[in-house]
């Protein structure tokens, strides 16, 4: 189970802490979308303190 959690954390693109977390997951989602990612959420693994972006296209 711990291995799965670590793999999920490594595979997701992490934004900086904050951006609405904790408390405003919509702000986190807006932030992630504004930087070119598909979505964002407050990550439970970090006790909802970090905004995690998913589906990012990568830096060019």
From Swiss-Prot:
SUPFAM superfamilies: Scorpion toxin-like. Keywords: Antibiotic, Antimicrobial, Defensin, Disulfide bond, Immunity, Innate immunity, Lipid-binding, Membrane, Secreted, Signal, Target cell membrane, Target membrane. GO terms for biological process: defense response to bacterium; innate immune response. Beta-D-GlcNAc-(1->4)-Mur2Ac(oyl-L-Ala-gamma-D-Glu-L-Lys-D-Ala-D-Ala)-di-trans,octa-cis-undecaprenyl diphosphate binds at residues 19-21, 31, 51. Disulfide bonds join 21-42, 28-51, 32-53, 37-56. GO terms for molecular function: lipid binding. Expressed in hemocytes. Antibacterial peptide mostly active against Gram-positive bacteria. It acts by selectively inhibiting peptidoglycan biosynthesis through complex formation with the cell wall precursor lipid II (1:1 molar ratio) thus inhibiting cell wall synthesis. It does not disrupt cell membranes. Is noticeably more potent than Cg-Defh1. This is Hemocyte defensin Cg-Defh2.
